[in-house]
A protein has these predicted regions:
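Active-site-proximal cap/lid insertion segments
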Residues: 27-40, 121, 125, 159-340, ...
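Short, structured active-site-proximal loop/turn typified by the sulfatase FGly-forming signature C/S-X-P-X-R
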Residues: 33-69, 75-80, 110-114, 274, ...
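Loop/turn elements at helix/coil->beta-strand transitions in domains of secreted/extracellular proteins
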Residues: 17-21, 51-56, 109-114, 163-170, ...
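Catalytic-site neighborhoods of secreted/periplasmic enzymes
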Residues: 71-170, 175-176, 180-183
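Secretory-pathway/luminal and periplasmic proteins that interact with or process carbohydrate-rich
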Residues: 55-56, 79-82, 177-183, 275-278, ...
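Acidic/polar loop patches that form or flank catalytic/metal-binding clefts of enzymes
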Residues: 55-57, 303-309, 327-347, 356-364, ...
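Cleavable N-terminal signal peptides of Sec/SRP-targeted secreted and luminal proteins
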Residues: 3-17
């Protein structure tokens, strides 16, 4: 008995405690030095990149806030977990009660969970953390943008964890750089860039934020936006908010280090969707689907400061965290079908030889953003091709409130109506009205402007991608998988919706 006890103590000393920190930005894109932007100052995110493996091919699984966060916390695409659109207010979308979320699974394995900042998902019975400081009980700007306030709550969680033998997951939902309501003319600025800057009367003061102010001529205009004075002023305000986001990342990483957890904590850094501009947020073109994605493992220091071509998605976060804690995903059913994760652990990308297959493609699924924005899309993206299925292609693409009430889009709209050159790489007509299927060769057409879906040359490529996409939709029990020309019946069969075949089906049913 004494020998057994001694062995247990001996091996317990060899076991490394493991924790996880998730840093999730809000509408954050690639505006960092680490991702090649030479105009912006982002020393803290760049420092994190130097102690991380940086994914050059990181993606969101859905380009919308609540849906994306539901995927981060459940590992299931939105058409499977039920969070079809925004959660807050009259939108009222939420996941199915039967979803087994990450905090729920970890709690069952004696792992402490905490969230500070923006949560924006429901129901609470599914997404329940042990420690919660979110917009559900506090002002969102204070717990999501006030980095000093956030620092104090994060410190509290980490200090409590020092006195707790359990490993932990801490999820930090930073509200920056989301646009600020009201979206035009508000005293806090279009990006809440004046909130707490200490320079604007009546907007407060955030002690730990040293605002960096940019002039319109100082910004880098991405290819998918028009290079106009309105766009540059809009981007300059966003850049200032990026400085608060970046300094927050530095503060939170320092709290982790000061608490003594830096050497045993996996850090995952990413965002929910692309920046809040046309062709990006709520779209599944690359500016909306592509995301910064970095993974810092204290046990894989040989990967620090390196970059990888491996493809990663927000759908991979749950499998990665479970792999880190050596926990198997539970067996259960929803809607009479077995539920399984279709993402993969990105810890495999930290190994010397990255396995092919799972890291060569990602999937995305979008249904709503706001409740009036019904525009379901399904996407498969490889390293050199992308196939988009627009299920509601007969309708115009809907615009989110913060995406039409902003200086950049209003300038495009006004120039179009007055007949002036928009300086945009596309037109409003093409932006609103899209083909049912869009196939892009990302090597020759990285800006996704030439649709090859009807090309004879790409017939086999189209067929192969469509087959793989449809299999994923079947595996994830997508209730939209028969649309737009067929209807999914309860027996899982797709029935055509034209009158003749529908009449035949009625006759067969009557018989």
């Amino acid at each position: 008995m004494m020998i057994k006890t001694w062995l247990m103590l001996c091996f317990a000393g060899l076991i490394q405690a493991k924790n996880v920190l998730i840093l999730l930005g809000d509408d954050v894109g690639f505006q960092f030095g680490a991702y090649g932007n030479t105009k912006i100052k982002s020393p803290n995110v760049d420092a994190l990149a130097k102690r991380s493996l940086l994914f050059k091919n990181g993606f969101t699984s859905v380009s919308s806030c609540s849906p994306s966060r539901s995927v981060v916390m459940s590992g299931l695409p939105v058409h499977q977990n039920g969070m079809y659109g925004l959660h807050g207010g009259f939108m009222h979308f939420q996941s199915f009660n039967g979803v087994r979320s990450l905090p729920m699974i970890l709690n069952q394995h004696n792992i402490r969970t905490g969230i500070v900042g923006k949560k924006h998902v429901g129901p609470d019975t599914v997404y329940k953390f042990d420690y919660e400081v979110t917009e559900e009980h506090y002002n969102l700007n204070q717990v999501g943008r006030n980095i000093t306030c956030m620092k104090e709550y994060i410190r509290k969680f980490l200090q409590d964890s020092k006195n707790d033998s359990r490993p932990f997951l801490l999820y930090i939902g930073i509200h920056d750089i989301h646009r600020c309501y009201p979206y035009i003319g508000g005293k806090l600025g279009n990006f809440c860039d004046k909130f707490g800057d200490g320079m604007t009367p009546g907007t407060g003061y955030i002690k730990d934020w040293k605002p960096i102010v940019y002039k319109p001529e100082d910004v880098e205009v991405p290819y998918f936006l028009p290079d106009t004075p309105a766009t540059r002023e809009d981007l300059a305000a966003m850049y200032k908010t990026y400085s608060r986001f970046d300094q927050g990342v530095g503060l939170f990483m320092k709290e982790l280090e000061d608490a003594g957890f830096a050497d045993d904590t996996l850090v995952i850094f990413t965002s929910d969707n692309g920046i809040p501009f046309p062709f990006a947020k709520t779209n599944l073109y690359d500016p909306g689907q592509g995301e910064p994605f970095m993974v810092s493992s204290p046990y894989h220091k040989e990967t620090w400061g390196k970059k990888t071509d491996a493809m990663a998605s927000t759908m991979d976060i749950v499998p990665t965290v479970l792999d880190w804690f050596d926990i198997k995903y539970p067996k259960y059913k929803m809607n009479s079908k077995q539920v399984s994760l279709t993402g993969k652990s990105v810890l495999n990308a930290l190994k010397p030889h990255v396995p092919p297959g799972p890291f060569d493609r990602v999937f995305s699924s979008h249904v709503f953003h706001e409740i009036t924005m019904y525009y379901p899309m399904r996407v498969i993206r490889t390293k050199d091709t992308k196939l988009i299925h627009n299920l509601n292609f007969r309708a115009p693409y809907g615009l989110a409130t913060d995406l039409y009430q902003n200086p950049t889009f209003l300038d495009i709209l006004n120039r179009t109506e007055s007949g002036q050159p928009t300086k945009w790489f596309t037109t409003l007509q093409k932006y609103y009205y899209r083909d049912e299927w869009q196939l892009f060769n990302l090597t020759s057409d990285p800006h996704e402007q030439k649709n090859l879906a009807g090309s004879a040359e790409y017939k086999n490529v189209f067929k192969s991608l469509k087959k793989t996409l449809n299999q994923w939709l079947l595996d994830t029990n997508d209730p939209w998988r028969c649309l737009p020309d067929e209807e999914l019946e309860e027996n899982g069969v797709c029935y055509p919706m034209d009158n003749r075949k529908f009449s035949d089906m009625q006759v067969n049913v009557l018989r």
